[in-house]
Regions:
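Structured inter-helical modules in multipass membrane proteins
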Residues: 67, 72, 78-159
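Juxtamembrane membrane-interface segments at transmembrane alpha-helix termini
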Residues: 54, 80-85, 205-214
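Transmembrane signal-anchor/signal-peptide helices with a preference for the extracytoplasmic
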Residues: 47-70
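Alpha-helical transmembrane anchor segments
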Residues: 2-31, 159-254
Length: 256
């Protein structure tokens, strides 16, 4: 349920939440806040902003780092493809099958790991005895070896999520802030009720945006794999699904 909600675009959530809060405010009975309640509201608001901002900044930075690393991985693979034009046609095709199979093992996968069996197969293929004196294949081997660092970065950064206790503190502070906002005495002026609805909607969207970044469902995060997908589309049209299937079976057999 939550996953479906997080996949809804923010442009759709905003008007929906605004209407819900506007209707909710019509049923709330505003109260005059005492000096003590106002002090509590002020302290809570400060704590919410103080605690929330670093979390959002860290998760946005996490997504930016993932995008940067995937682009770096794409450039390495593109360099390998460029170098492969100097190989014999059959050797190049076999290399591309292994590259495509490797790419399929990481694209859109939430559990990318530094240890990758298709990466191992690429290393083994490029380091065969028959390529010992092949300078082009030696360069490709070095490029392939560099991808391990990228996968390690993706794995480590992906694990840097918002922990449960951080969510608990954030949601408690958010709930208190939202409650005080909805208790504000706006009188009978509809305009101020609309302003409060906008404020409540904004607060809620901030939490949703944090959740989207944390779960990598934000629009920015969804574009993370675009460079690799584009590379796959532009340079691997000659690799068939059967060839990828056979390569997976071959690698699985080698592991047994």
């Amino acid at each position: 349920m939550m996953k479906k909600i997080l996949n809804i675009r923010l442009s759709y959530l905003y008007p929906t939440l605004f209407v819900l809060f506007f209707l909710a405010l019509t049923r709330f009975t505003p109260t005059k806040l005492t000096a003590g309640q106002l002090a509590l509201y002020s302290v809570n608001t400060f704590l919410f902003g103080f605690y929330f901002s670093p979390l959002l900044s860290a998760q946005k930075g996490r997504v930016d780092e993932l995008i940067k690393t995937v682009r770096k991985e794409t450039m390495i693979l593109l360099d390998i493809l460029t170098q492969s034009h100097l190989l014999k046609a059959e050797d190049r095709h076999q290399l591309k099958i292994r590259l495509r199979t490797y790419m399929e093992s990481i694209i859109d996968k939430p559990d990318v790991k530094a240890d990758n069996v298709y990466y191992d197969e690429l290393l083994h293929f490029t380091k065969q005895e028959k390529y010992k004196d092949n300078s082009v294949m030696n360069v490709i081997y070095e490029r392939v070896a560099k991808t391990q660092e990228n996968r390690d970065t993706i794995q480590n950064v992906s694990l840097n999520r918002v922990y449960s206790h951080e969510w608990l503190v954030t949601l408690v502070l958010f709930g208190i802030t939202l409650y005080f906002v909805m208790q504000t005495d706006y009188g009978s002026v509809i305009f101020f009720r609309a302003l409060l609805a906008v404020l409540c909607t904004g607060l809620s969207l901030m939490i949703i945006i944090l959740a989207k970044y944390a779960t990598l469902t934000h629009k920015q995060a969804k574009r993370m794999w675009t460079p690799l997908k584009q590379l796959r589309t532009d340079h691997f049209e000659d690799i068939t699904a059967d060839e990828i299937k056979d390569m997976r079976a071959y690698v699985a057999k080698q592991r047994d």
